[in-house]
Swiss-Prot record:
Gene that produces this protein: pepA
Molecular function per GO: aspartic-type endopeptidase activity
PROSITE patterns cross-referenced by the UniProt entry: ASP_PROTEASE, PEPTIDASE_A1
Entry superkingdom: Eukaryota
UniProt PTM: Two isozymes of this enzyme exist which differ only by their non-covalent association with carbohydrate.
Database matches in SUPFAM superfamilies: Acid proteases
Pfam families to which the protein is assigned, alphabetical: Asp
Compartment(s): Secreted
Organism: Aspergillus oryzae (strain ATCC 42149 / RIB 40) (Yellow koji mold)
Active site: D111, D293
Residues that span the membrane, as ranges: none
Record-stated family: Belongs to the peptidase A1 family.
Name of the protein: Aspergillopepsin-1
Secretion signal span: 1-20
Length: 404
């Protein structure tokens, strides 16, 4: 787990200049390239919809950044209250990205909030491999002597194991000698998610958790092969999205990209927005220092901002037993806007209606919740699903535009 000191909310100068970087895959004689990798749907043979504990999801997100999990949230995790139906509900579909590792294709979560590539492996007991595609070191793989990794989260989930160097291919671009963290121990929380075979981190390599020597992320390994050292994310609401590596796809967004400088001193895609607004209300000039994180579902903000939002939601209340703010499912939620320079990044209200507390419940849990005094905000999938976001390692900087 990465320990994060509290960060002061310091405004960063933002601009809305148009990108001068490549806007489509190139076929140069120097073998540089760009590629798009699409997420896939993977259905599992379960009876009824897939469920997940909202308090567990929430507490894991806090712990990921070294935050303190409040007592009421720990209690909600322990009690099992607040089990939500994950979205999208129909057919129990989860969105993952195929990655070929050592000749085996695994379906991984791409996570801009971490820097490890860890996978289910043949080192796990057979019972824990069931339902998963697992990593088997190729004939060209080599084990890194003395290297190990160990992750744990606030909901009690954990994984650990050995480290190999092997061939990793995403969308036709190959990383030779890429560090692959092979799980030999894993908690039930991960085992039970039969859709997911591991994680590919896209934060900065400085926070890779391999010991004694941190390893390089897949992106840092391959970025010199790309037309431009960037990737762009298009997550979708209740639909598969895509990742563009090495180029910006102008067909996927409207208007011009608004750029924000990134502070990578703690290894994250951290930036500062200028303010926010709720519904059709006036913009509030209140700097929001946050992290763009595809590996976190929720948007987690300072209490005063969260409270200001739910004051505009009829019937909303902060329910300790559920782990956070809830409201009647039929409530029409206002949009939430993050102000980035002269650009307004709008989260539609329907994206903020995260899910029912449990199957058949008329009470729903919100996709915007408190950061519990973390000292910075987390802008997860609830925010990202309405945006085309460019993660540009030159600068570094983030570019935002509304999805087309």
């Amino acid at each position: 787990m990465v320990i994060l000191s509290k960060v002061a909310a310091v405004a960063v100068g933002l601009s809305t200049v148009a990108s001068a970087l490549p806007t489509g895959p190139s076929h140069s004689p120097h073998a540089r390239r760009g590629f798009t990798i699409n997420q896939i749907t993977r259905q599992t043979a379960r009876v009824g919809p897939k469920t997940a504990s909202f308090p567990a999801i929430y507490s894991r997100a806090l712990a990921k950044y070294g935050g303190t999990v409040p007592a009421h949230l720990k209690s909600a995790v322990a009690s099992g209250h607040g089990t939500v139906v994950t979205s999208p509900e129909p057919n129990d579909i989860e969105y993952l990205t195929p990655v070929n590792i050592g000749g085996t294709t695994l379906n991984l979560d791409f996570d801009t909030g971490s820097a490890d590539l860890w996978v289910f492996s043949e080192e796990l007991p057979k019972s824990e491999q069931t339902g998963h595609d697992v990593y088997k070191p190729s004939g060209n793989a080599s084990k890194i002597a003395g290297a190990s990794w160990d992750i744990s989260y606030g909901d009690g989930s954990s994984a650990s194991g050995d480290v190999y160097q092997d061939t990793v291919t995403v969308g036709g671009v190959t990383a030779q000698g890429q560090a692959v963290e092979a799980a030999s121990k894993i908690s039930d929380q991960f085992v039970q998610d039969k859709n997911n075979d591991g994680l590919l981190g896209l934060a900065f390599s400085s926070i890779n958790t391999v010991k004694p020597k941190p390893q390089t992320t897949f992106f840092d390994t391959v970025k010199d092969q790309l037309d431009a050292p960037l990737f762009a994310v298009t997550l979708k609401y209740h639909a598969p999205g895509s990742y563009d590596f090495g180029f910006i796809d102008k067909s996927k967004f409207t208007g011009e990209l608004a750029y924000a400088d990134v502070d990578d001193s703690q290894g994250f895609w951290q930036f500062t927005a200028d303010g926010y607004s709720v519904g059709k209300g006036d913009a509030q000039k209140a700097p929001i220092t946050g992290i763009a994180d595809t590996g976190t579902t929720l948007v987690m903000l300072d209490d005063e901002i969260v409270d200001a939002y739910y004051k505009q939601v009829q019937g909303a209340k902060n329910d300790a037993s559920a782990g956070g703010y809830v409201f009647p499912c039929e409530t029409e939620l206002p949009e939430f806007t993050v102000v980035i320079g002269s650009y307004n990044a709008v989260i539609p209200g329907k994206h903020i209606n995260y899910a029912p507390l449990q199957e058949g419940s008329s009470t729903c849990v919100g996709g915007i919740q408190s950061n519990s005094g973390l000292g910075l905000s987390i802008l997860g999938d609830v925010f990202l699903k309405s945006q085309y976001v460019v993660f540009d390692s030159q600068g570094p900087r983030l570019g935002f535009a509304a999805q087309a």
